UniProtKB/Swiss-Prot annotation:
Annotated transmembrane regions: none
GO biological process: defense response to virus
Gene: Ifna2
Quaternary structure and interacting proteins, as annotated: Interacts with IFNAR2.
Protein known as: Interferon alpha-2
Matches recorded under Gene3D superfamilies: 1.20.1250.10
GO cellular component terms listed in the entry, alphabetical order: extracellular space
Recorded superkingdom: Eukaryota
Organism: Mus musculus (Mouse)
Amino acid sequence: MARLCAFLVMLIVMSYWSICSLGCDLPHTYNLRNKRALKVLAQMRRLPFLSCLKDRQDFGFPLEKVDNQQIQKAQAIPVLRDLTQQTLNLFTSKASSAAWNATLLDSFCNDLHQQLNDLQTCLMQQVGVQEPPLTQEDALLAVRKYFHRITVYLREKKHSPCAWEVVRAEVWRALSSSVNLLPRLSEEKE
């Protein structure tokens, strides 16, 4: 009987260890994929940014709001996922495909899609984790409003090449800033 109990305990420990080893290594994978996506996004530049200064606009990226909210891991992952999804939606639109080099656009969108898969895997592992809904909802709403402002801007500018260049630079800034949420993920993992 003692051997059976020891064997069962060992199985439980091993299965728990294997589940944890399959766990969410998001800071590392997200950072690598994000760097690759940013590199491709930089390569997508078609116009000198200085030639589009008259089209510049402050879209009010909600990073300040996100930073001030002391977002925990359970909240950071949905915010990163929404930021990535909204970026993917923007760059997979019909108007976007006309504005960019198809090879670079496909590469960028593939990187975003891989990031979404990583984020979704981590979200699935958080099932049952209680998260403060108000803070998370505020951050998600801020991200959605930010992308709505970008979409309205593109529509008002009739998806001009300069408008897309301004948006490309803005999205580059947003994705670059998103890595600021990663230390929170690393801290909670330890």
